[in-house]
Amino acid sequence: MLGSSGRRLLTTVLQAQRWPFQPSRDMRLVQFQAPHLAGPHLGLESGNGGGVIDLNAFEPTLPKTMVEFLEQGEATLSVVRRALATQLPVLPRSEVTFLAPVTRPDKVVCVGMNYADHCREQNVPVPKEPIIFSKFASAIVGPYDNIILPPESQEVDWEVELAVVIGKRGKYIKATDAMAHVAGFTVAHDVSARDWQMGRNGKQWLLGKTFDTFCPLGPALVTKDSVADPHNLKICCRVNGELMQSSNTNQMVFKTEELITWVSQFVTLYPGDIILTGTPPGVGVFRKPPVFLKKGDEVQCEIEELGVIINKVV
């Protein structure tokens, strides 16, 4: 059961949503915990901002982690379709804790400078090839978890991103086949320590991107058939209620299919792998003067049809 602070956050979540979302029959997969459960369970979010249907209670043979669920492919998805067609008990949102929809993926792939308007913000040319870097999976936290400011950095910044979740293993994937390898989409916050990303560690991006808690995800993995067009979604970020980033995924330079084709030339993609597809303009480092996160700040990252994640900085 949530305490008063948790109830306040729930109210904030519901108030934060600015755009219309898909109806509750859409497939919005979550990982969650509840006081009466022995450990994490898989669930269905009953509409964006709604309660949770416990899929493991509906079908006890289902895996309890998203990666294992995705590895089983169509067999597990058919169970979820049956659950959607059945009147099932819904756990109130106030009684569950949302985890990241995917935890412990094989890899988290990230894409830099992948929004045309973000390139204009930096006064740099649009890349001719995707710029790829990574985060460690240990950076992943849930949609309402805290972001911990590391004492090693004084320049921690925000980046809202559309995240693609892989559902089918593949290597050398053709663009025409790429969407067949996608399970769905979720909201990501690519928290970034700019001093480490841009000035230290030989200007290699990894350390500045992968401090603990630097990859909030959620609230749900929305399956691809529940998203009208992933490349035409409003995307925004607010810090303490102030709009900092506002764009549309139609500004992406390299779309999902191109990114999957490119990345799969170098590495095998596995179910549960996550691809963060880049951020729009409005990040703190390019403001005049620059603005960075501080303790007590609250960051809301929101994408149309997918939902909103809210993380307090501590």
Curated annotation (Swiss-Prot):
GO molecular function, one term: metal ion binding
Enzyme Commission (EC) number: 5.3.2.2
SUPFAM superfamilies xref list: FAH
Cofactor comment: Requires a divalent metal cation for activity.
Annotated residues for binding of Mg(2+): E159, E161, D190
InterPro entries for the chain: FAH, Fumarylacetoacetase-like_C, Fumarylacetoacetase_C_sf
Listed GO biological process terms: oxaloacetate metabolic process
Modified residues (N6-acetyllysine): K203, K234
GO CC, any one term: mitochondrion
Any Pfam family hit: FAA_hydrolase
Claim: Transit peptide is one of the keywords in the record: yes
Catalytically driven reaction(s): oxaloacetate = enol-oxaloacetate
Protein keywords: Acetylation, Isomerase, Magnesium, Metal-binding, Mitochondrion, Transit peptide
Modification sites for N6-succinyllysine: K203
Chief location of this protein within or outside the cell: mitochondrion
Compartments it resides in: Mitochondrion
Transit peptide: 1-84
CC cofactor: Mg(2+); Mn(2+)
Protein task: Tautomerase that converts enol-oxaloacetate, a strong inhibitor of succinate dehydrogenase, to the physiological keto form of oxaloacetate. It is thereby required to maximize aerobic respiration efficiency by preventing succinate dehydrogenase inhibition.
Family the UniProt entry places it in: Belongs to the FAH family.
Official protein name in the record: Oxaloacetate tautomerase FAHD2B, mitochondrial
Organism classification: Eukaryota, Metazoa, Chordata, Craniata, Vertebrata
